[in-house]
Design a protein with these regions (language model features):
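Short, polar loop motifs at secondary-structure junctions
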Residues: 1
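Flexible "cap/lid" subdomain of the alpha/beta-hydrolase fold that forms the substrate-access gate
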Residues: 4-40, 44-167
Length: 167
């Protein structure tokens, strides 16, 4: 999110769907003159990369996806341990402005606690990097983050189910 664009949303969350993001990436690669390319995605970007490969397969030379499993499979396998570790999946999909308001009450605390829970090295982010994360963690960024998760729990699941037979 950060300095990236944050389009207005709608009730379907389509502007934040992985399909919409993948289409943006495909258009960018076309604009840059890349008819085909190797594609790597990590975490949320891995979901976008997967959608790009499904919708624009003729452009993909190879695909590497890191640190994800299919969203529907993750929801289907949800148990207490998953819900505890991935609580934000369920918190961020709540209707606006609930998560935005709660996070916005102390955005620095929320961001530091989330980033601090990633990995096993508590000081992995330099003070300069953390300052930049905090600079970017605006109300618009918080809303865009929530919209990404809302799309994942709604329209992205529909898109994935519609073409489940594609590799």
């Amino acid at each position: 999110y950060g300095d990236s664009g944050k389009p207005p949303t709608n009730s379907s969350h389509a502007p934040y769907s992985k399909r919409n993001m993948a289409n943006d990436m495909a258009q960018l690669m076309d604009y840059l003159g890349h008819e085909s390319f190797h594609l790597v995605g990590h975490d949320r970007g891995g979901r976008v990369a997967h959608r790009l490969a499904r919708d624009h397969s003729a452009h993909i030379k190879s695909l590497t996806i890191l640190d994800i499993a299919p969203t529907a499979a993750m929801y289907a396998a949800t148990n207490m341990a998953f819900a505890r570790a991935y609580y934000h999946w369920f918190f961020l999909i709540q209707p606006a402005p609930l998560p935005e308001t709660l996070i916005g009450g102390n955005p620095e605390f929320y961001l530091r606690s989330k980033i601090g829970s990633w990995g096993h090295v508590s000081d992995a982010h330099t003070p300069e990097a953390m300052a930049d994360y905090l600079r970017c963690f605006t109300p618009e960024t918080i809303h865009a983050s929530c919209e990404d998760y809302r799309a994942a729990a709604t329209i992205d699941l529909i898109h994935d189910a519609d073409d489940a037979d594609k590799k």
